[in-house]
Design a protein with these regions (language model features):
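A domain-level signal for caspase-like cysteine endopeptidase catalytic cores
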Residues: 2-63, 99-101
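Active-site-adjacent structural elements in enzyme catalytic domains
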Residues: 10-11, 93, 105
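Short acidic, S/G/P-rich loop/turn micro-motifs used as interaction or catalytic elements
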Residues: 21-25, 45-47, 65-72, 104-108, ...
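Short, glycine/charged-enriched secondary-structure capping and boundary segments
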Residues: 30-32, 74-77, 113-115
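Short, well-ordered coil/turn elements that cap or connect secondary structure elements
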Residues: 34, 93-95, 111
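Short, T/G/N/S-enriched strand-turn elements that build extracellular solenoid repeat scaffolds
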Residues: 48-53, 71-72, 87-91, 110-111
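A short, glycine/acidic-enriched catalytic loop
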Residues: 67-94
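Active-site-proximal C-terminal subdomain of hydrolase catalytic domains
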Residues: 97-190
Length: 190
């Protein structure tokens, strides 16, 4: 069964969301739900299909867990981890509008000389918070702190002016807690 769904795009732009299926990043669905975008969330999708889909879209939104090396996908059926977005995709992404939220995605795009809306380290789990000395949150509470960010991204994702998009997101994602403070510093425009 393929987990690729075809949707409608806004203003004649073809938008592709790459968000590998992962319960720990379900809150990220709020960024694109109801938008009618094409979505890839199948962790076993072939690299050739990913490349084909990227080539046929104008704007690429990439969400999930990752590293400076790319966006990670985990196939529960096989136990295999892989970079579903990696250095081999850089050349085709250079001609696209790119938006990403995975840990250190800004380092990936900066290394390849690409602009766009990208994140540094974003705390999305209690384990990550503890790595940065934030101990008072559990996974559920962290997911709750992220919802204003997800809703702000949902409401601004179609904006052309990325600086204005970032300004509005930071204005709306402004809770008085350590996770929010940490994450706000890592919402970047390249």
């Amino acid at each position: 069964m393929s987990l690729y769904t075809r949707g409608k795009s806004y203003d004649m732009k073809k938008v592709l969301v790459i968000h590998p299926d992962d319960r720990s990043t379900d809150m990220l669905k709020a960024v694109y739900e109801g938008k009618g975008y094409d979505v890839i969330n199948d962790p076993s999708i072939s690299d050739d299909e990913i490349v084909e889909q990227i080539k046929s879209h104008d704007k690429i939104i990439m969400l999930g867990h990752g590293t400076p090396c790319g966006l990670i996908s985990w196939n529960r059926a096989t136990g295999e981890f892989r970079y579903i977005i990696n250095d081999s995709h850089a050349d085709i992404l250079k001609d696209k509008e790119t938006y990403s939220m995975w840990c250190f995605s800004d380092a990936f795009f900066e290394r390849h000389g690409m602009g766009g809306f990208h994140s540094g380290m974003i705390i999305s789990e209690a384990m990550e918070a503890r790595m940065y000395g934030i101990i008072e949150f559990n996974d559920e509470e962290i997911a709750e702190t992220l919802m204003p960010l997800m809703h702000a991204m949902h409401d601004t994702i179609e904006m052309e002016d990325l600086q204005e998009m970032r300004r509005i997101i930071l204005e709306r994602y402004d809770a008085n807690d350590q996770v929010t403070w940490f994450n706000r510093r890592n919402i970047n425009i390249l």
